[in-house]
Regions:
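Short beta-strand-loop/turn "lid" adjacent to the catalytic site in phosphate-handling enzymes
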Residues: 4-48, 72-86
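Short, well-ordered amphipathic alpha-helical segments that serve as non-catalytic structural scaffolds
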Residues: 1-4, 104
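Phosphate-binding/catalytic loop of phosphoryl-transfer enzymes
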Residues: 49-129
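Generic beta-strand or strand-like secondary-structure segments
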Residues: 3, 13, 54-58
Length: 129
């Protein structure tokens, strides 16, 4: 940051990429002690984005500012029927790059003159974070 001309004290808050926490709705969340516990002992496994929550907390604590994470990969907004796998006793789980996909879908909806909620889009994440 300093190499780019910024100091941590220049910011009012920090935001890290969310990791594999418990399933939650899409949104912006304050990095809580529970979020820290979840990424330290991830309920759904390791993911590089778990570091985003830890780094945001660390930077926030250093500067005395709030730390947030947004649309983690554990976002679950699937309908009940979408959780049906076709195998008795086995449900489908929701894991996807919510931050990337929701961001581009919001941009596409705006270009179409629609709200995110009314747009009907197919978004494909082809890697790269």
């Amino acid at each position: 940051m300093e190499g780019a001309g910024y100091r941590l004290t220049d910011f009012d808050a920090v935001c890290g990429r969310g990791g594999l926490l418990r399933h939650i709705p899409s949104g912006t969340y304050l990095v809580s002690d529970q979020a820290i516990r979840d990424v330290m002992d991830p309920p759904y496994g390791e993911h590089a984005s778990n570091l985003g929550v830890l780094l945001a907390r660390e930077l926030g604590d250093m500067a005395g500012i709030p730390a947030f994470f947004v649309d983690p990969v554990c976002v679950d907004e699937m309908t009940p029927v979408a959780h049906v796998s076709g195998f008795r006793g086995m449900q489908r789980e929701s894991f996807f790059h919510a931050l990337n996909q929701k961001s581009i879908a919001r941009k596409a909806a705006k270009l179409l003159g629609k709200s995110y909620e009314e747009a009907r889009l197919t978004v494909v994440h082809v890697g790269g974070g």
